[in-house]
Amino acid sequence: MIRQRTLKNSIRATGVGLHTGEKVYLTLRPAPANTGIIFRRVDLDPPVDIPGHALNVGDTRLSTCLSQGEARVYTVEHLLSAMAGLGIDNAFVEVSAPEVPIMDGSSGPFVFLIRSAGIEEQNALKRFIRIRKPVRVEEDDKWAAFEPFNGFKVGYTLHFDHPVFTEQNGFAELDFSSTSFVKEVSRARTFGFMRDIEMLRANRLALGGSLDNAILVDDYRILNEDGLRYQDEFVKHKILDAIGDLYLLGHSLIGAFKGHKSGHSLNNKLLRALLAQEDAWEEVTFDQASDSPIAYDRPGLAVAG
């Protein structure tokens, strides 16, 4: 059977929050089967647990924020993307501040942490959400959609009127039966425009942003001396974000996602629209690995196929 997964060991890291600029202590811990991904604010007294679920999403300005009462955890999407890419169903994520550390702006450091902790299969069937009917949400010229697909596929189109963004690097569609999340997506960094930085910081956002954890673009060019990690790193980061946002369904997805200029807000609207339309999805498990369109070859390397 395809089993649920958690971490073998706890592991710790330190970083800064992208928007708060605060130092953050992060601890990833194993969790029992059927727990899901639980974010825990250990700096609060008493600590507050916030399940990583679409219905707990509050603020979606520039990042995805989970909330429970007055407690918040911002910028969860890059860590969740790594959890999804490696097939981690259950974990406790402890943070000492209201934000997951940005690390290098990608999911790569989280992939490294999870692999370093080790991945353990649990004695429980892995639960998937399978898309049965198309679901679409729109805002002006932006849209996001789910379609039935026997596997996991993500397509995204971004558009900015800027010389750095071209048709060649503005669209990507990845079928994870033939694409490695770790190799082709996980290292794509978040990006931002210098012209927006002053406005963001005036609103106490992006206080921890730097060339060490983001691709920065002025009116003409990329400012990072080392350039891009992928030719299409911008759109691949949007795919990375979407994978993290989609994992707030609580389970791995069997289906196709397409986004056109969508962001965290529209992604969450799509999840809520899907969950509200009960005949558009179903929860499934697989007793035999050969029956599943998503295969996990061995702990540590999750491959859709």
Swiss-Prot record:
Cofactor entry: Zn(2+)
Keyword Hydrolase included in the entry's annotation: yes
Organism the protein comes from: Alkalilimnicola ehrlichii (strain ATCC BAA-1101 / DSM 17681 / MLHE-1)
NCBIfam families: lpxC
Keywords, ordered alphabetically: Hydrolase, Lipid A biosynthesis, Lipid biosynthesis, Lipid metabolism, Metal-binding, Zinc
Catalytic reaction equation(s): a UDP-3-O-[(3R)-3-hydroxyacyl]-N-acetyl-alpha-D-glucosamine + H2O = a UDP-3-O-[(3R)-3-hydroxyacyl]-alpha-D-glucosamine + acetate
Top-rank EC class of the record's enzyme: hydrolase
Active site: 264 (proton donor)
One Gene Ontology biological process: lipid A biosynthetic process
Assigned EC number: 3.5.1.108
GO cellular component: membrane
Alphabetical list of InterPro entries matching this protein: Ribosomal_Su5_D2-typ_SF, UDP-acyl_GlcNac_deAcase, UDP-acyl_GlcNac_deAcase_C, UDP-acyl_N-AcGlcN_deAcase_N
Family of the protein in this entry: Belongs to the LpxC family.
Biological pathway: Glycolipid biosynthesis; lipid IV(A) biosynthesis; lipid IV(A) from (3R)-3-hydroxytetradecanoyl-[acyl-carrier-protein] and UDP-N-acetyl-alpha-D-glucosamine: step 2/6
The keyword Hydrolase is annotated on this UniProt entry: yes
Residues that bind Zn(2+): 78, 237, 241
Cross-referenced HAMAP family: LpxC
Role noted for this protein: Catalyzes the hydrolysis of UDP-3-O-myristoyl-N-acetylglucosamine to form UDP-3-O-myristoylglucosamine and acetate, the committed step in lipid A biosynthesis.
Matches recorded under Pfam families: LpxC
The protein, known as: UDP-3-O-acyl-N-acetylglucosamine deacetylase
Gene Ontology molecular-function annotations: metal ion binding; UDP-3-O-acyl-N-acetylglucosamine deacetylase activity
Gene: lpxC
